[in-house]
Amino acid sequence: MLAYIKGNLEMKMTDYVVIDVGGLGYKVFMSENGIENLGNIGETVKVHTHYRVREDDISIFGFNT
């Protein structure tokens, strides 16, 4: 279980961001509003997470603190 992810914001798309933590890029799905309020590329960000595991999918959903 992941409680949160803190790292360097590498990419912003319409429905997800990529956060680099120690050289590993986490794809975190977020709302458009959450992405807009997250920060700028290159900044350190912290996102609370929900880690969803299904038979055919593993996803991370992020929420602003």
Placement of each model-derived feature along the sequence:
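Conserved hydrophobic positions within beta-strands
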Residues: 7-9
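Long, highly charged, low-complexity intrinsically disordered interaction regions
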Residues: 2, 11-65
